[in-house]
Design a protein with these regions (language model features):
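Flexible loop/turn connectors
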Residues: 238-329
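Alpha-helical recognition/docking segments in bacterial nutrient-uptake
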Residues: 1, 63-67, 71-176, 241
Length: 329
């Protein structure tokens, strides 16, 4: 069977082709009775608008690019952060009658392909996730004129509008909690130094300790469980007498719990542990993990609204966080 055309719908509804075009493209200038007749003809004939032709009329593709600057193996690992953000973004876009186009550039060639794709008019906006260091992509995408919003504060000098959680404040609350529990030799497992979440959570840790005159002790991780275990082992070697650790992610905190068990340290009797994120697994570690809850879904929903609104407001949106106290402290 041949695909029904605009002309066929117009003939069935008894109106012009231009009127049908306005109705199917969402124009509000058509008489309600005529609109009803056109929509009835569309349903009876099974007419489906041509996406390419429709985008020429509306100047919109109906798609939003979700650019994740991580290798696919990391995005689809056991880190629940990525799955929750991607799921929330897709659901929010579906509610707005949009779809997500997932892109994961992990090389300069991949970044160039993303830039060409966006500059070619294939998406109506871009959401950037998990930016690292002096990533050239934000500046390149901003030059295309397409609305661009970042999930998290960009570290690069190119600063698209962004939404984030209060990483500095959350780290402060975590370390202050450990001090209030009587802990005196508090170490940290920080995130990557080329990511704002890593930098800001380390800054919050150092701010609280500097106010007490205590020495800071840090080991660097990459937000994975394995890096948390390795960093914890290094911290115990550097300072066997430490009595608390603030890990900048829950996955690194679970790695720290594993390393502490292997070293024969009791949690929280010998070493108290605090994480950051409040992933579902934090309630089921042994012991259950004290952590800083960040509103991952709320941040993701806000970013979608920002990009759909055209990213006109450059004022950052920062969500508060909450300390969740469990048995690990």
């Amino acid at each position: 069977m041949k695909r029904p055309t605009l002309e066929a719908v117009a003939a069935r509804a008894g109106v012009s082709r231009a009127t049908v075009s306005r109705v199917v493209n969402g124009s509000d200038t058509v008489n309600p009775d005529i609109r009803t007749a056109v929509l009835r003809a569309v349903k009876e004939l099974g007419y489906v608008p041509n996406p390419a032709a429709r985008s020429l009329v509306t100047q919109r593709t109906g798609s939003i690019g979700l650019v994740v600057s991580e290798p696919p193996a990391r995005v689809f690992s056991d880190d629940p952060f990525f799955s929750q953000v991607i799921r929330t973004v897709c659901l929010e876009l579906e509610t707005a009658d949009r779809q997500a186009v997932l892109m994961m550039p992990s090389s300069p060639d991949g970044q160039a392909r993303v830039e060409r794709y966006v500059a070619g008019g294939h998406v109506d906006g871009v959401i950037l996730l998990s930016l690292h260091g002096a990533d050239p992509l934000p500046a390149a995408l901003l030059r295309t004129g397409v609305p661009v919003v970042s999930h998290g504060r960009p570290v690069s000098t190119a600063r698209p509008p962004y939404c984030d959680a209060d990483n500095v404040g959350g780290a402060r609350a975590a370390v202050q909690h450990l001090l209030d529990r009587g802990r005196r030799r508090i170490a940290t497992i920080s995130g990557p130094p080329d990511m704002s979440a890593g930098l800001d959570r380390l800054a919050g840790y150092r701010e609280i300790l500097s106010g007490t005159g205590r020495r800071s002790l840090a080991a660097i991780g990459d937000f994975t469980r394995e890096s948390g275990a390795a960093a914890m082992a290094q911290l115990l070697e550097d300072d066997p007498g430490l009595d608390a650790v603030f890990a900048a992610s829950d996955l690194m905190a679970t790695g720290a719990l594993y390393a502490l068990r292997r070293a024969g340290r009791r949690v929280p009797d010998d070493v108290a542990v605090v994480g950051f994120d409040d992933i579902d697994a934090a309630r089921f570690t042994d012991p259950p993990l004290t952590t800083v809850r960040q509103p991952i879904a709320e941040v993701a929903r806000t970013i979608v609204r920002m990009v759909l609104d055209g990213a006109d407001d450059t004022t950052p949106v920062i969500f508060p966080v909450e300390l969740i106290v469990r048995d690990s402290t």
